[in-house]
Amino acid sequence: QPNPDEFFGLM
């Protein structure tokens, strides 16, 4: 499951 930190890092 993707971590929130990595998800925001893509944005």
UniProtKB/Swiss-Prot annotation:
Identification of the protein by name: Substance P-like peptide 1
Sequence positions bearing Methionine amide: M11
Compartments (UniProt record): Secreted
One CC-aspect GO term: extracellular region
Pfam (any one): Tachykinin
Database matches in InterPro entries: Tachy_Neuro_lke_CS, Tachykinin_dom
Protein family according to the UniProt entry: Belongs to the tachykinin family.
Tissue specificity remark: Expressed by the skin glands.
Major localisation: secreted
Gene Ontology annotations of biological process type: defense response; neuropeptide signaling pathway; tachykinin receptor signaling pathway
PTM annotation (Pyrrolidone carboxylic acid): residues: Q1
